[in-house]
Amino acid sequence: GGRLLALVADIDPGTGALITAIFCILFTALAGMLSIAYLDVGNGLLMTFAVMLGVAFLVNDAGGLSIAFSELRPDQLSMFGDMGSQAALALFLPTMFLLLGEANMYQKFFSAKDARAAKMAVVGWIAGTLIVETLIDSIGVFGSQVIPGLGTEASEAIVISVAMQALPTVVGIILVCGASAIIVSTANSFLLTPATNLMRDVYQRFINPDVSGTQVLLYTRLMVVALGVIGYVAGNFFPTILAMALWAYT
């Protein structure tokens, strides 16, 4: 979030991170699961529409899909690129196991009204992940031709760079909004899930089984704030922890 605001609004990344943290913490604490679930639907639609629009404009500017492909390097069109099958598998397996064990997704699945809705949610999640991730990667690949010569650090923000430099203003704004939706949705889930687990699975189960529903709601909101502050401090003042988390997640 800090890097996104730094690129878009030209503010200090640290200030951007603080603004993002405050917004996400307050929103998650005040909204709760039901509101976040509905927000995630809107975020998902916005993400999908934004990346589809971005890819469509990049391909159109290149003169069509065949011309866009012809301008890519051979390794960009091969299955494993220049890394080989072993390195590709080393990236695939951790990501796969991460998704299979992502607690915030299971929390949403278990919140479904019935088994059929939960199964449909799983199918939609898998299909949506494949579609959106493929489109995001496509923006990165096609964008590397529009904005060549990016270093390692700059290439990590290529989606935002494409939105600001290569796309029409309206389309770029939509793509930036899609990126913002991804950040907010991820932060909401990563705050609400551990807070709920700590309250339901630890506090209510082992410490105070007779706690009322009103107290659970209040304590969960306070836990969201506490975890958000801890996460912000860990990410900004202990960079090695953030680096390991980013490595594990990406």
Regions inferred by a protein language model and the residue ranges of each:
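Membrane-embedded helix-loop-helix hairpins and adjacent transmembrane boundary segments
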Residues: 1-250
